[in-house]
């Protein structure tokens, strides 16, 4: 029996069917008419490729002293024909105005912070410098006159506190230089020093003041204890009696060590107060709100 074979099975899953001659004639006149099935087109079954955007690299954002500037990520929706653009073109000028408002607030805050750093840095620098120099002169004078330290522990503890005070003076001068840098970068906030670096410097200055204050306190306590021991020894040996061997009365130079330790403590106290206030001003939450203009 002869049969007419249709084309072999295609990739779309249509299989070949064998038709008889009689059925072929009727199929040619009835089925393959103007009302016949549409011709098979493999292109219609091919999967449509969608043009999507898997990732979008947003422009780098600028974060300066609590403000986030720029970095807005536009939203694209998948489309089979073309990219979908924003429907409201007026949103771009609105974002620009918001960024300008944020930049103005950042510049204003940088200028205010620079003035605060300069004021407190100058107070801490000059106050610590005077107190530390006076303490160093008193300690040196007592050593030169007596020829040797009255108590080695007292001398070394007080000297360590004075050395830490000089380091704190140098740190306070760094605050003044930082204020000038902040004032220059208020025009271009992108060049401003990061807040993390400023906070790290302030914390380092606070640690120097705490260590120096502790050393000066130890020196003062040792000096006071030594003077109390001397005073008790002097009261046990009146002047009208014979002076025993090894007797050493309380001298004015011994009291100078107390004054040196007190000046060192004052120096570290000034530096600590200024550093803590500057740290508070930098890390305090920003209460200023950015006014967002309404786009018509």
Swiss-Prot record:
One of its GO terms (molecular function) is protein homodimerization activity. It is a multi-pass membrane protein. It comes from the Eukaryota. GO terms for cellular component: chloroplast; chloroplast envelope; chloroplast inner membrane; mitochondrion. One of its GO terms (biological process) is protein import into chloroplast stroma. Residues 1-90 form a transit peptide. It holds the Pfam family DUF3611. The keyword Plastid applies. The chain crosses the membrane at residues 125-145, 156-176, 208-228, 250-270. Disruption phenotype: Seedling lethal when grown on soil. Albino or chlorotic dwarfed plants that accumulate unprocessed precursor proteins and chloroplast ferritin clusters when grown in vitro. Ubiquitous. Highest expression in green tissues and very low levels in mature pollen. Its main location: plastid. Keywords: Chloroplast, Membrane, Plastid, Plastid inner membrane, Protein transport, Transit peptide, Transmembrane, Transmembrane helix, Transport. It is found in: Plastid, Chloroplast inner membrane. Involved in chloroplast protein import across the inner envelope membrane. Also acts as a chloroplast permease regulating the iron transport and homeostasis. Involved in the uptake and sequestration of iron in plastids. Homomultimer. Part of the translocon complex. This is Protein TIC 21, chloroplastic. It comes from Arabidopsis thaliana.
């Amino acid at each position: 029996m002869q049969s007419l074979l249709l084309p072999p099975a295609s990739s779309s899953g249509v299989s070949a069917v064998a038709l008889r001659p009689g059925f072929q004639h009727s199929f040619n006149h009835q089925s393959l008419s103007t009302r016949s099935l549409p011709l098979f087109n493999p292109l219609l079954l091919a999967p449509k490729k969608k043009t999507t955007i898997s990732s979008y690299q947003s422009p780098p954002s600028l974060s300066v002293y609590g403000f986030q500037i720029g970095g807005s990520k536009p939203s694209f929706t998948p489309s089979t024909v073309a990219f979908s653009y924003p429907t409201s073109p007026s949103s771009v000028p609105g974002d620009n105005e918001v960024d300008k408002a944020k930049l103005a607030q950042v510049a204003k805050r940088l200028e205010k912070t620079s003035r605060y750093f300069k004021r407190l840095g100058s107070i801490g620098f000059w106050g610590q410098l005077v107190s530390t120099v006076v303490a160093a002169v008193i300690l040196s004078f007592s050593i030169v006159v007596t020829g040797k330290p009255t108590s080695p522990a007292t001398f070394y503890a007080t000297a360590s506190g004075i050395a830490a005070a000089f380091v704190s003076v140098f740190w306070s001068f760094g605050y003044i230089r930082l204020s000038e840098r902040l004032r220059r970068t208020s025009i271009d906030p992108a060049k401003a020093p990061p807040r993390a670096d400023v906070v790290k410097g302030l914390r380092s200055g606070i640690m120097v003041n705490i260590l120096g204050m502790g050393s000066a306190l130890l020196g003062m306590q040792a000096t006071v204890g030594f003077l109390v021991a001397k005073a008790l020894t002097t009261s046990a040996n009146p002047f009208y009696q014979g002076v025993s061997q090894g007797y050493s009365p309380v001298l004015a130079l011994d009291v100078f060590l107390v004054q040196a330790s007190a000046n060192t403590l004052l120096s570290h106290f000034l530096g600590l107060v200024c550093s803590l206030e500057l740290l508070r001003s930098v890390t305090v939450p920003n209460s200023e709100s950015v006014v967002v203009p309404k786009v018509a």
